Amino acid sequence: MPFTPIKLEAFGSREDLYDAAASVLVGALTTAVARHGRVGFAATGGTTPAPVYDRMATMTAPWDKVTVTLTDERFVPATDASSNEGLVRRHLLVGEAAKASFAPLFFDGVSHDESARKAEAGVNAATPFGVVLLGVGPDGHFASLFPGNPMLDQGLDLATDRSVLAVPPSDPAPDLPRLSLTLAALTRTDLIVLLVTGAAKKALLDGDVDPALPVAAILKQDRAKVRILWAE
């Protein structure tokens, strides 16, 4: 089913992109707290958002009324270098933003599937999200919903009652077990921000997006507004 392409918002430099993204995210959280009293922030991992989180951590917002969680996570403890929780704790949950609560996806001492089930209570309590921040992979994945993965269909099903899924490794990705919020959970918000850099991702998202790509499900849903912020 065709859908109207979302215009990409381009910035002249990555520094400008990071500044703008931080402002958009903190503004959305502040507005949502005024409306709902308490909200969540679903934060993505990876290298691109770290400078955005550094900026957000210095900004004034009603952080004590915000619960931060993750769009997805590797099934590793926060002390692991690849942990998204570790990234968020180092870059966002410091300074002003240290007042925010945190709802993890990974739980130690339980199985992969049990961790996903256990995470759902915290994620559900964090909704509605004031804003959701997502990256997009070169294969069109978002969160840890990868093309060809056995959990993709359930992850994209807006009617599922699951908020968090245990995503197994698959070929070619992911290489490690993951935990991922579902599209149904990620759209419990007024605003989803896609933060992307580089020519390849611009080509992926600019204009008509291949409907077979997982990210197409984000762009064609009508529950939440989507903004795409990009810089080379």
From Swiss-Prot:
A Pfam family of this chain: Glucosamine_iso
Enzyme Commission number: 3.1.1.31
Keyword Hydrolase on entry: yes
Sorted UniProt keywords: Hydrolase
Catalytic reaction annotation: 6-phospho-D-glucono-1,5-lactone + H2O = 6-phospho-D-gluconate + H(+)
Alphabetical GO biological process terms: carbohydrate metabolic process; pentose-phosphate shunt
Biological or metabolic pathway of the protein: Carbohydrate degradation; pentose phosphate pathway; D-ribulose 5-phosphate from D-glucose 6-phosphate (oxidative stage): step 2/3
Record SUPFAM superfamilies: NagB/RpiA/CoA transferase-like (SSF100950)
The keyword Hydrolase belongs to this UniProt entry's keyword annotation: yes
Superkingdom to which the source organism belongs: Bacteria
GO molecular function: 6-phosphogluconolactonase activity
Similarity section: Belongs to the glucosamine/galactosamine-6-phosphate isomerase family. 6-phosphogluconolactonase subfamily.
Functional note: Hydrolysis of 6-phosphogluconolactone to 6-phosphogluconate.
Name of the protein this chain belongs to: 6-phosphogluconolactonase
Organism this protein belongs to: Caulobacter vibrioides (strain ATCC 19089 / CIP 103742 / CB 15) (Caulobacter crescentus)
